[in-house]
Regions:
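Alpha-helical membrane insertion/targeting regions
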Residues: 1-203
Length: 203
């Protein structure tokens, strides 16, 4: 939400975040290839796919808000998100049974569940995009980007913030950013209620 009221600066920051996350995704895939049996790199891989699908939905929601049509890209990253969600839930069960440090199976479960719920959301939204108001798309954009930021920050703190207590490394980003997601989502929801009920196609 940096310079949210200044679209030009907001786009610059948004594009920087988008390409930075693409680098993170590529590096996490490389890490998993090198260390396929490492719970840490498995978690980073799952998070990176979640972030990839998130930033794609976040960016595409702006285009859809402006009247663009739903394309195969929407369904492609929705399918990828669903596969990743099922995989993360499976890894959660595996690491619970294996006795891995408790934070890993918990977060696999949390982010896996988020992925599955997002698949349901995508199906509802992309099946009937004409029913959404511009502010509905904006709310989807904001919540998705904040969700991607939460996931990527979690990966960063786990990887680099070893000076923090273990619970802060693994759960701190969610504890700090989730309230912001609810706050801005609530503001956009309130704006939506005040707005005219006209769908996108009539604007």
């Amino acid at each position: 939400f940096y310079n949210f009221k200044d679209p030009k600066k907001h786009r610059i920051v948004g594009k920087t975040f988008f390409y930075a996350m693409l680098v993170v995704v590529i590096s996490s895939i490389s890490g998993l290839i090198k260390h396929p049996h490492s719970a840490f790199f498995q978690f980073l891989f799952g998070i990176s796919i979640l972030v990839l699908c998130g930033i794609l939905r976040g960016v595409r929601s702006i285009f859809l808000m402006k009247g663009a049509a739903v394309t195969n890209l929407e369904w492609a990253y929705t399918i990828l998100l669903g596969i990743n969600g099922i995989w993360m839930l499976g890894m959660s069960a595996y690491h619970f049974n294996a006795g891995t440090m408790i934070a890993i199976p918990i977060l696999f479960s949390v982010f896996g569940t988020m992925s599955v719920l997002d698949v349901r959301k995508n199906w509802q939204v992309f099946s009937q995009p004409q029913l959404l108001h511009r502010l509905d798309w904006m709310r989807l954009h904001a919540s998705t980007m904040l969700g991607a930021f939460t996931a990527s920050t979690t990966a960063f703190t786990v990887n680099a913030a070893h000076f923090l207590p273990w619970w802060a490394q693994w759960f701190g980003p969610t504890m700090l950013i989730l309230p912001l997601q609810f706050y801005f989502g609530g503001k956009l929801k309130a704006m939506r209620k005040k707005a005219a009920p006209a769908p996108i196609e009539t604007m």
